[in-house]
């Protein structure tokens, strides 16, 4: 698998020893708290510090925030531009958690584009971890998410991405396709995920 499926330059590289803050803080953290955690790990051989869920939008619980990929300035004054150098000064790279395939119903993104979430017309949308799934079969959805994530990644020296997905696909129906083509959505969705991954991989 490593020789034939994993692409260069990752194929031969040694994986860094990393830690993240999730179990230590869940959604309740500040920049100073994260730096304190990183300092505590400094002498343990940790090479990469990953900031987990809760750094963006109104993400104080798992009921909100997904889809609004802008840094929460109350938690992280000065944004990633201010936080990342503080972590790097401890001799660690900086990694970032994202869950770009998902959206919260209370998010600005969902309020503006409710049709961008998968869901069968006339039926309540299925929720997992209080979130819906964005329709990555649609180009405009992918372009929006790609642009939002790239803006975040361009703001600081991000060495690693933790791409999460905390629920399964269900009620897979795209508002962009007629009923007789809904069987294509699963396949088109996966191709859409590959599209964003490929673009980000080429960028960075």
Question: What label would you give each PLM region?
Answer:
Residues 1-8:
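Beta-strand-rich recognition/accessory modules
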Residues 13-17, 45-47, 88-94, 157-159, ...:
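Short, well-ordered coil/turn segments that N-cap beta-strands
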Residues 72-89, 110-204:
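Active-site neighborhood of glycoside hydrolase catalytic domains
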Residues 14-18, 60-64, 127-130, 174-178:
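A short alpha-helix capping/helix-coil boundary motif
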Residues 16-25, 34, 66-70, 130-134, ...:
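Glycine- and acidic
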Residues 25-111, 142-144, 188-195:
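Aromatic- and glycine-enriched glycan-recognition loops and surfaces
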Residues 12, 19, 47-58, 97-100, ...:
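Core alpha/beta catalytic barrel or barrel-like domain that forms the active/cofactor pocket
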Residues 8-13, 57-58, 118-125:
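Flexible hinge/switch segments at interdomain interfaces of large molecular machines
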């Amino acid at each position: 698998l490593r020789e034939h499926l994993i692409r260069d330059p990752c194929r031969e590289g040694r994986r860094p020893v990393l830690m993240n803050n999730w179990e230590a803080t869940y959604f309740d953290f500040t920049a100073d708290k994260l730096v304190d955690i990183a300092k505590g790990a400094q002498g343990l051989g940790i090479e990469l510090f990953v900031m987990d869920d809760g750094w963006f939008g109104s993400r104080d619980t798992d009921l909100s925030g997904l889809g609004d990929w802008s840094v929460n300035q109350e938690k992280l004054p000065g944004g990633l531009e201010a936080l990342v150098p503080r972590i790097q000064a401890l001799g660690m790279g900086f990694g970032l958690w994202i869950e770009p395939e998902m959206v919260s119903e209370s998010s600005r993104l969902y309020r503006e584009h409710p049709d961008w979430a998968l869901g069968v017309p006339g039926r309540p949308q299925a929720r997992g971890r209080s979130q819906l799934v964005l329709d990555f079969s649609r180009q405009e959805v992918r372009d929006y998410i790609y642009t939002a994530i790239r803006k975040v990644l361009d703001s600081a020296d991000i060495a690693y991405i933790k791409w999460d997905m905390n629920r399964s696909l269900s009620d897979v129906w795209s508002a962009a396709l007629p009923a007789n083509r809904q069987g294509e959505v699963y396949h088109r969705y996966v191709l859409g995920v590959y599209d964003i991954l490929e673009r980000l991989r080429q960028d960075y």
